[in-house]
């Protein structure tokens, strides 16, 4: 009789252990959903918002853009470029091509309050800065593709007498129905200057910033 009791208890324990092992991967899968790229993310009614930061100077070796620039001549040159360099059109054309090629139905959003969203990569650490309720009042969509762009200058780490031009494109997908972040990624391009700081013209500066933007676009092209 004892052997029979031990056998029944053993079978029950083994059955429960198997059931627990079967359930664990399912929970893990639900908590670790990741996507290879933005096109893998399931979306419904989609709005696309392009948020371009003014050209500035990056805090060295970071992606933080500062509009307070030590050099007045460089500051004035960047202001001139800002007034005539239409980054929005370049990013918009690229975004529309990718979305059209992949048969998305979407709405481009031209007017918005920049205070409603962070101007960088959105992560679980800063998603609380997204003002979802205000966004939903302004945007009648289920999902929002937010494309943040930062372009500017930094010092060449190998030669402080030269600059580098950098452009970062942050692709964020927000779930407006559930106040959640679905996906985010960064693409960044860098161009090294051939000329020393004191020999830079506005045209050369614009050329290098545009090349850093093109390099970033090329990275996106290769992925999408």
Regions found by a protein language model. Give the residues of each.
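Sec-dependent N-terminal signal peptides
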Residues: 4-14
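Short glycine-/acidic-enriched loop or helix-start segments at secondary-structure transitions
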Residues: 12, 58, 156-158
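C-terminal/domain-edge helix-coil "capping" segments
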Residues: 18-47, 54-58, 161-224
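Active-site-proximal beta-strand/loop segments in catalytic clefts of secreted hydrolases
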Residues: 49-52, 148-150
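Sec/Tat-exported extracytoplasmic proteins
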Residues: 50, 91-103, 216, 220, ...
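N-terminal segment of the mature soluble domain
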Residues: 55-146, 180, 184
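A charged, solvent-exposed segment within the mature domains of Sec-exported extracytoplasmic proteins
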Residues: 124-192
């Amino acid at each position: 009789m004892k052997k029979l009791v031990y056998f029944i208890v053993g079978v029950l324990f083994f059955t429960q252990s198997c059931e627990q092992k079967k359930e664990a991967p399912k929970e893990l899968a639900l908590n670790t959903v990741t996507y290879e790229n933005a096109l893998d993310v399931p979306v419904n009614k989609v709005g696309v918002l392009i948020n371009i930061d003014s050209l500035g100077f990056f805090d060295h070796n970071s992606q933080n853009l500062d509009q307070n620039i030590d050099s007045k001549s460089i500051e004035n040159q960047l202001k001139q470029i800002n007034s005539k360099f239409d980054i929005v059109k370049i990013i918009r054309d690229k975004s529309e091509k990718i979305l059209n090629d992949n048969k998305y139905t979407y709405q481009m959003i031209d007017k918005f309050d920049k205070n409603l969203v962070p101007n960088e990569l959105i992560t679980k650490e800063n998603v609380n800065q997204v003002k979802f309720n205000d966004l939903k009042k302004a945007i009648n969509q289920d999902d929002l593709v937010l494309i943040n762009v930062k372009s500017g200058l930094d010092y060449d780490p190998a030669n402080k007498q030269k600059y580098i031009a950098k452009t970062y494109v942050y692709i964020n997908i927000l779930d407006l129905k559930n106040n959640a972040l679905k996906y985010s990624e960064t693409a960044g391009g860098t161009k090294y200057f051939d000329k020393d700081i004191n020999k830079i013209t506005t045209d050369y500066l614009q050329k290098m910033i545009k090349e850093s933007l093109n390099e970033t676009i090329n990275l996106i092209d290769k992925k999408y």
